[in-house]
Design a protein with these regions (language model features):
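Walker A/P-loop-proximal flanking segment of P-loop NTPase domains
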Residues: 1-92, 99, 105, 265-275, ...
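Phosphate-handling catalytic cores of nucleic-acid transaction enzymes
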Residues: 46-47, 53, 105-118, 216, ...
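Flexible beta-alpha connector loops of hexameric P-loop NTPases
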Residues: 57, 138, 142-149, 213-224
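P-loop NTPase motor core
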Residues: 84-89, 97-184, 279, 283-289
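Structural recognition of the conserved hydrophobic beta-strand(s) that form the central parallel beta-sheet
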Residues: 131, 199-203, 228-232, 242-251
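Substrate-engagement module of ASCE P-loop NTPases
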Residues: 160, 184-194, 219-245, 267-276
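Conserved P-loop NTPase "ATPase switch" module shared by AAA+ and STAND
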Residues: 193-223
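C-terminal helical "lid" subdomain and adjoining coupling/linker elements of P-loop NTPases
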Residues: 197, 214-215, 244, 300-419
Length: 419
């Protein structure tokens, strides 16, 4: 058995600048879609600038497919679902997916640096409307810089499509907070956009609908009007030539904060025309972590060397206890699978990723991909700065003696106030 000493990952891996420096604000990993759409200068450049965003983004198979389909819809190609539902776990890549769609539609050439995206459709000038249901106030609406107020989700969507041509089509509907019918929405998507493609991104729909129930409108409520609009919108987009709608819902009833009935009702409103999308699955989280936390691609020779060394040790131990030829073959096969997975995960030990994905996800507070990024970034910064890194960053290498890392871990698990 080889006695070669493996180099610590911190001596081999180049970290992303904000991980290296430890400048890890919540805004770096928690994407604010509405702020991105508004080009808010407070949004980190890595999220606000399309080229920087896609340089730091790993396109999973499902995200690639989603981008390809939506851009094709906006180009006017047929045979694609124009209404798509994102159903992801809390922190499971939903906001990042919506931001990817926003940047791709607004600046298609930002994808040109990604080989697998070079043949995606180029729809030209796209009118993009973003509705953030967590931020948009159901009672007071949204006040513009000129003092005017947009009262409803349909008013805000129309304003973003075109304040001069689209918004007047629903101005009275917005004022009275009455949902426009299908004919008006159809005009909104065509005449209101001056014939340009239209992409509508709806985030946190459930949260807005829940608050809208408290706003009375004669014998109705804003929630009822919003549900009518949502259903009409999905139907009209589904039958359009150059429009697409992507909306998000929570993954489960537990994440719906007890409003299971409303979740099911919203789900049903678009069930005839929408199609489910899950942007991140399985081990696709590994290159996502690498792309965002590392400043360059992992060193292939180092990854190969480390994974082969682990394979040698684990296979040797299993073969030592194998009693039959079949068990020895199984030990060899499991060793190869471990080697391949470790090489793909480098500089992370797959066991650490599995703990977060399979155990921590049972904790309501843990935000999946986003939480993993924040926690791993704090670990890598600490080990790079203070030393102590091993060949891989695994469960046994987490620097829990570092106060910042320990606080970050407890916060991600929602128990920071218990200690």
């Amino acid at each position: 058995m080889s006695t070669h000493v493996l180099r610590p990952w911190a001596d081999v891996v180049k970290l992303h600048p904000d991980v290296e420096t430890g400048v890890l604000t919540e805004a770096v990993f928690a994407i604010d879609l509405g702020a991105i759409a508004a080009n808010d200068p407070n949004v980190p450049v890595v999220n606000r600038d399309p080229e920087a965003f896609f340089r730091a983004t790993y396109l999973t198979a499902d995200l690639r497919k989603l981008l390809e389909e939506v851009l094709a819809c906006l180009k006017g190609k047929s045979g694609y679902n124009r209404v798509l539902k994102l159903r992801t776990p809390f922190g499971g890549g939903k906001s990042h997916t919506l931001a990817s769609l926003f940047h791709a539609a607004r600046k298609r050439e930002a994808l040109d640096g990604i080989p697998e995206a070079k043949d995606f459709a180029r729809p030209g000038n796209v009118a993009v409307a973003v509705f953030d249901g967590e931020k948009f106030d159901a009672r007071n609406g949204k006040t513009l810089d000129d003092g005017r107020t947009i009262q409803t989700m349909w008013g805000w969507i129309a304003w973003q499509i075109d304040p001069e041509k689209a918004f007047p089509l629903v101005a009275e509907h917005d004022k009275d907070r009455v949902a426009p019918g299908g004919d008006v929405i159809r005009d909104l998507l065509t005449k209101g956009a001056s014939g340009h493609p239209v992409l509508i991104l709806l985030d946190e729909v459930l949260k807005y609908m829940e608050r809208a129930a408290a706003v009375g409108i004669l014998d109705s409520t804003l929630q009822r009007q919003a549900k009518d609009f949502f259903q009409n919108l999905t139907v009209e987009v589904a039958g359009s030539e150059k429009a697409a709608l992507v909306y998000s819902l929570t993954w489960s009833a537990r994440e719906a904060l007890g409003n299971v009935g409303l979740l099911a009702e919203i789900d049903k409103l678009a069930s005839r025309v929408d199609q489910l999308r899950e942007p991140v699955s399985g081990d696709e989280v590994l290159p996502i972590l690498q792309r965002r936390l590392l400043g360059a691609a992992p060193d292939v020779p180092s990854a190969t060397e480390v994974s082969a060394a682990y394979q040698e040790v684990v296979t040797g131990m299993q073969r030592a206890h194998a009693e039959t030829a079949s068990e020895r073959r199984q030990a060899d096969e499991e060793g190869r699978l471990l080697r391949d997975r470790m090489r793909a995960a480098y500089p992370f030990h797959p066991a650490l990723i599995d703990i977060m994905r399979e155990r921590w996800t049972a904790v309501d507070a843990f935000q999946r991909t986003r939480g993993a990024l924040r926690f791993l970034a704090s670990c890598m910064h600490s080990l790079k700065k203070n030393g102590g890194a091993k060949a891989l960053l695994g469960p046994g290498e987490v620097p829990v003696k570092d106060v910042d890392v320990r606080v970050k871990m407890l916060k991600e698990l929602g128990v920071q106030n218990d200690y």
